[in-house]
């Protein structure tokens, strides 16, 4: 939704397609997948499926994805889990929206999908100047990044002690991207 006008048509393709998740590693929100699609994944045991969770709060997920069915789509994860489908997850973090306590809640909730959910990465939302008609979002500051990393590292320790794995990971952007910390 943040693409500049005048680019080639293939760049505007919405890649929320389970086949692209399985074949190319794309992340899907599950919002446009039918029960038939989920049944096909289960039947053929297509793994891994990469899921963009954003949050485990159904109401907030609807708001974030601007889709009234986005919260219900989380029930599809239950079905994948029950069938033993391997999954990877990501949380695209938006400052003041799904960070802080919401992030901690989501991390706790996602543990119910262990061991099928092998890992979850937390990445900052990518912001461009092409945001017309979209929710206003602020970039993370260096201090914000430190807070996010502290939450992730805290949970990594908990999961390592409890399960022998880290499970939750910070995307490289939290460490390396100077453009992430605008205004600092």
Where are these predicted regions, by residue range?
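Conserved residues at the C-terminal ends of beta-strands
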Residues: 52, 123, 171
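Residue-level detector of flexible, active-site-proximal loop/helix-junction positions
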Residues: 124-127, 175
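Conserved Radical SAM active-site core
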Residues: 1-116, 126-154
């Amino acid at each position: 939704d943040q693409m500049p006008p005048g680019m080639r048509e293939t760049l505007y393709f919405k890649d929320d397609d389970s086949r692209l998740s399985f074949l190319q590693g794309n992340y899907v929100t599950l919002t446009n997948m039918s029960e038939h699609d989920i049944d096909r994944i289960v039947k053929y045991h297509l793994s891994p499926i990469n899921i963009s969770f954003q949050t485990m709060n159904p109401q907030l997920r609807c708001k974030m994805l601007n889709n009234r069915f986005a919260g219900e789509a989380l029930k599809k994860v239950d079905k994948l889990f029950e069938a033993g489908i391997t999954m990877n997850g990501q949380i695209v973090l938006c400052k003041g929206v799904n960070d802080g306590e919401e992030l901690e809640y989501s991390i706790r909730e996602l543990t119910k999908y262990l061991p099928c959910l092998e890992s979850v990465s937390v990445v900052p939302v990518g912001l461009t100047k092409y945001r017309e008609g979209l929710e206003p979002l602020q970039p993370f500051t260096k201090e914000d990044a430190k807070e996010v990393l502290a939450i992730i590292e805290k949970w990594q320790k908990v999961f390592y002690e409890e399960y022998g794995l880290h499970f939750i990971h910070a995307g490289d952007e939290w460490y390396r991207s100077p453009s992430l910390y605008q205004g600092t």
